[in-house]
A protein has these predicted regions:
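Cysteine-centric segments in proteins
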Residues: 1-83
Length: 83
C-alpha cells in the first residue's frame, strides 16, 4: 500500500478565544498558497505529532467542503502538506 508523503508546514491562523478557554480557528493562511476559511470544526482532540513525536492538539475542520486536519502545538499552528 502506498502512503502519501507529507511535510509539516507552519501556518497563520485567525482564531476566536472564548472566556471558557475554548479556541475556535476561523481562517488558515498558508504563505505563498493563500487564505482558507474554516467552514466547520468537527472534532478537537490530542494526537502524537508525526515529526516531533510530541503531543499536539488536532482540529478536524472542513475547508472548501473537504475534511482536513489542523494542528496546534505550544501556540504554533501547522498542517501536513503533500510533498
Amino acid at each position: 500500500m502506498l502512503t502519501e508523503s507529507r511535510r509539516k508546514q507552519y501556518v497563520e491562523v485567525l482564531a476566536t478565544h472564548y472566556v471558557d478557554g475554548e479556541v475556535r480557528p476561523r481562517t488558515i493562511h498558508i504563505p505563498l498558497v493563500g487564505e482558507f476559511d474554516i467552514e466547520e470544526v468537527k472534532r478537537v482532540g490530542l494526537t502524537k505529532d508525526h515529526t516531533t513525536h510530541e503531543i499536539a492538539k488536532q482540529y478536524t475542520v472542513v475547508v472548501k467542503g473537504k475534511e482536513t486536519h489542523l494542528f496546534e502545538d505550544s501556540g504554533r499552528w501547522f498542517v501536513l502538506m503533500r510533498t
